[in-house]
Amino acid sequence: MYSLIRKCLFLMDAETAHNFSIQALKLAGKLPINVLPMPLNPVEVMGLQFKNPIGLAAGADKNGEAIDGFGKLGFGFIEVGTVTPVAQDGNPKPRQFRILEAEGIINRNGFNNLGVDVLVENVKKAKYDGIIGINIGKNAVTPIERALDDYQICLRKVYEHADYITVNISSPNTKNLRTLQYGEALDDLLRSLKSEQESLSQKFNRYKPLVLKIAPDLTDEEIASVADGLVRHKIDGVIAGNTTLSRDPVVGLKNAEHQGGLSGNPLNTLSTRLISTLAKELNGALPIIGSGGIHSVASGQEKIDAGASLLQVYSAMIYQGPALIQNLAKHIQVR
């Protein structure tokens, strides 16, 4: 069934196909029946109860429009966003490119979204009863030295409506954003956001975990530095990781020359290495959510065995369809 749907979708350019899929899932979310069953493979992470360990990665549903539709595919959790304080168009089109031979995707979207207020309203309307994470970022026009302001604005607005909040400082498509992963800039950001989280937990009388999303392109030394900051500031979890700027796995393939972040199967080895290195540095101090290149039960289990407690998928679903989510959710064994 999905092979036919995929043929139709792949007649469109990547972004048009994505937008069509979001609208179809938005419609499916309103139907009174499940598209696919919710596989029960429960796990507790960050004090939250997940029906299964397979989540939708951020970037798929930037505005939270299709939460109920994605929920009907069997995801144990859904992360919406990345969202910014005000709406922005993102980078010029075309900005999404398929690498068919490798089942990869390059995007340089640039946090295109309708703004945090629209996302919050969509989350409030959603009937999905799984875990919802909200991924927050900064507007492109905000100077990097004022990035904290944007993260604080978003954190305050989404806190009441999220089960956990992810701070995205690792997209390669917003100028200078990745500099927040290093040294004093990271320290200042984590310290301030942790303080804000504590204030909000008192205000709403409920603690919501704070998660950091990092890049797979970090060196071992940089990973160690990030891990140290996560532990010192008592951050609740880390997503490893975002898209890569490396083209080593796709050299010579059609569309590999485009600028942007590479995701999908070509990212698998790099993301597993990030998880493994991070796990050694953290030594169980906080959970890792594995993301990047998961395209089979074997590749997903490899990330669990490397140290991840949960997994997120997006690009592989574009190539393989929702059956992948069902297989992962049923067969992944969390240690």
Swiss-Prot record:
<dbReference type="Pfam" id="PF01180">
    <property type="entry name" value="DHO_dh"/>
</dbReference>
<keyword id="KW-0560">Oxidoreductase</keyword>
<feature type="binding site">
    <location>
        <position position="293"/>
    </location>
    <ligand>
        <name>FMN</name>
    </ligand>
</feature>
<dbReference type="InterPro" id="IPR012135">
    <property type="entry name" value="Dihydroorotate_DH_1_2"/>
</dbReference>
<dbReference type="GO" id="GO:0006207">
    <property type="term" value="P:'de novo' pyrimidine nucleobase biosynthetic process"/>
</dbReference>
<feature type="active site" description="Nucleophile">
    <location>
        <position position="171"/>
    </location>
</feature>
<keyword id="KW-0665">Pyrimidine biosynthesis</keyword>
<dbReference type="GO" id="GO:0005886">
    <property type="term" value="C:plasma membrane"/>
</dbReference>
<keyword id="KW-1003">Cell membrane</keyword>
<feature type="binding site">
    <location>
        <begin position="314"/>
        <end position="315"/>
    </location>
    <ligand>
        <name>FMN</name>
    </ligand>
</feature>
<feature type="binding site">
    <location>
        <position position="213"/>
    </location>
    <ligand>
        <name>FMN</name>
    </ligand>
</feature>
<comment type="function">
    <text>Catalyzes the conversion of dihydroorotate to orotate with quinone as electron acceptor.</text>
</comment>
<keyword id="KW-0285">Flavoprotein</keyword>
<feature type="binding site">
    <location>
        <position position="62"/>
    </location>
    <ligand>
        <name>substrate</name>
    </ligand>
</feature>
<feature type="binding site">
    <location>
        <position position="264"/>
    </location>
    <ligand>
        <name>FMN</name>
    </ligand>
</feature>
<feature type="binding site">
    <location>
        <begin position="107"/>
        <end position="111"/>
    </location>
    <ligand>
        <name>substrate</name>
    </ligand>
</feature>
<keyword id="KW-0472">Membrane</keyword>
<feature type="binding site">
    <location>
        <begin position="242"/>
        <end position="243"/>
    </location>
    <ligand>
        <name>substrate</name>
    </ligand>
</feature>
<feature type="binding site">
    <location>
        <position position="168"/>
    </location>
    <ligand>
        <name>substrate</name>
    </ligand>
</feature>
<dbReference type="InterPro" id="IPR005720">
    <property type="entry name" value="Dihydroorotate_DH_cat"/>
</dbReference>
<feature type="binding site">
    <location>
        <position position="168"/>
    </location>
    <ligand>
        <name>FMN</name>
    </ligand>
</feature>
<dbReference type="InterPro" id="IPR001295">
    <property type="entry name" value="Dihydroorotate_DH_CS"/>
</dbReference>
<comment type="subunit">
    <text>Monomer.</text>
</comment>
<dbReference type="InterPro" id="IPR050074">
    <property type="entry name" value="DHO_dehydrogenase"/>
</dbReference>
<dbReference type="InterPro" id="IPR013785">
    <property type="entry name" value="Aldolase_TIM"/>
</dbReference>
<comment type="pathway">
    <text>Pyrimidine metabolism; UMP biosynthesis via de novo pathway; orotate from (S)-dihydroorotate (quinone route): step 1/1.</text>
</comment>
<dbReference type="InterPro" id="IPR005719">
    <property type="entry name" value="Dihydroorotate_DH_2"/>
</dbReference>
<feature type="binding site">
    <location>
        <position position="82"/>
    </location>
    <ligand>
        <name>FMN</name>
    </ligand>
</feature>
<protein>
    <recommendedName>
        <fullName>Dihydroorotate dehydrogenase (quinone)</fullName>
        <ecNumber>1.3.5.2</ecNumber>
    </recommendedName>
</protein>
<feature type="binding site">
    <location>
        <position position="241"/>
    </location>
    <ligand>
        <name>FMN</name>
    </ligand>
</feature>
<dbReference type="GO" id="GO:0106430">
    <property type="term" value="F:dihydroorotate dehydrogenase (quinone) activity"/>
</dbReference>
<dbReference type="GO" id="GO:0005737">
    <property type="term" value="C:cytoplasm"/>
</dbReference>
<keyword id="KW-0288">FMN</keyword>
<dbReference type="GO" id="GO:0044205">
    <property type="term" value="P:'de novo' UMP biosynthetic process"/>
</dbReference>
<comment type="similarity">
    <text>Belongs to the dihydroorotate dehydrogenase family. Type 2 subfamily.</text>
</comment>
<feature type="binding site">
    <location>
        <begin position="58"/>
        <end position="62"/>
    </location>
    <ligand>
        <name>FMN</name>
    </ligand>
</feature>
<feature type="binding site">
    <location>
        <position position="135"/>
    </location>
    <ligand>
        <name>FMN</name>
    </ligand>
</feature>
<feature type="binding site">
    <location>
        <position position="173"/>
    </location>
    <ligand>
        <name>substrate</name>
    </ligand>
</feature>
